[in-house]
Amino acid sequence: MSTETTKPSITTTPTTVLVSPNTLKRKKGEDTSEEQLEAEIKRVALKDADSHSDNDHDSPDNVPSDVHLRMLCLVKHASLIVGHKGATISRIKSETSARINISNNIRGVPERIVYVRGTCDDVAKAYGMIVRALLEEHGNEDNGEDIEISINLLIPHHLMGCIIGKRGSRLREIEDLSAAKLFASPNQLLLSNDRILTINGVPDAIHIATFYISQTLLNFQMESPQKNVKRSIYYQPTQFNSVLIDHSQPNTIFHQRNHQYHPSDKLLSYKPNKNLPISSTLLSMATPQYTTASVANATAFQPNFVIPNVTVLDGPVISPAPGNHLLMNFVQQEIFIDEKFVGNVIGKDGKHINSVKESTGCSIIIQDPVEGSSERRLTIRGTFMASQAAIMLISNKIEIDRSNAERKRRSPL
């Protein structure tokens, strides 16, 4: 009788793992050590777990349970949220079970982004604790619950509609339920398709408002999964593109509401006149002016022909970037296109106009039609280079569709 013994885990492994589709890869007659075989068993188990999780995600019964809300804040407020040696943010994480991260503190960048992910209850509780932490750090431990504060959430453009609701119905409903005031910026932030949603109120009101906002986004994800997969270009703080303005007032996080945000807000806040149109002479010295008259003699990236299908107005409004960075100057350009091609520029379900916005980072607003006018006005706002690229893309789209229509008209039946 042989005295040699073998562990059950090794001898039974070839028969037990055959149930899994991820079978062990072992050559016949090959000597395999116990450690190698155990590692192979773990590999198979991990693959099986991954396949089960994939199947769970694909099942119709699986519904999203977590939401992701981002808050834009100043660097000094982000440091208050983190707390001394990370004590404050660690306490918020432990008490809410939410995952909280803060973007890197980059030198010269005045803003940071707070990322909060979790269930609706956890996210709302986390934001309630965040605003209370901001008030406590300003010395309002006793009556901080009665002081109003504002936070700025970053919401992708395609999700803002579900928060606003039809004719603002959902926005007003959240205000009534929470006693907070909500302000949705009408335009996208530059170089992204994020919009600002400002919540103003006492900590309890912000807590309740963020809960209903999270719930609204979660319901939208479940009801319209196809719309939720749209690609988002998230706002990234830079030293050239600052959204928030710090007035050095305690207990306030302020930004200019209901207009397109730009970095000149801080620079021009102490000047009597903002965004004055610059004369053609001055424009030619600072940033090249893009007009049908000047484009024929233009250099660099501009082609040597008149831009077809687009009428470009002279004298764009320029917002100078900090430090006189000419390439980062923001311009607001007015152009006109033929009324007949407005639908072509927009595209089905806004596909083409959104593509131009995403590829250039510009904000493009199509004004309402004017009775009796054969042209439609478009307002393009972005960096100088990006706005010119947007104009070229719009012109190119009209030219292609015009040529296709002409070809169909001439082709025999």
Swiss-Prot record:
Keywords: Nucleus, Repeat, Ribonucleoprotein, RNA-binding. InterPro entries: KH_dom, KH_dom_type_1, KH_dom_type_1_sf. SUPFAM superfamilies: Eukaryotic type KH-domain (KH-domain type I). Pfam families: KH_1. SMART domains: KH. Residues 66-130, 148-213, 330-394 form the KH domain. It is found in: Nucleus. Residues 1-23 have a biased composition (Low complexity). GO terms for biological process: regulation of gene expression; regulation of RNA metabolic process; telomere maintenance. GO terms for cellular component: cytoplasm; nucleus; ribonucleoprotein complex. Residues 1-36 are annotated as: Disordered. GO terms for molecular function: mRNA binding. Interacts with PAB1. Present with 1590 molecules/cell in log phase SD medium. This is PAB1-binding protein 2. The lineage of its organism: Eukaryota, Fungi, Dikarya, Ascomycota, Saccharomycotina.
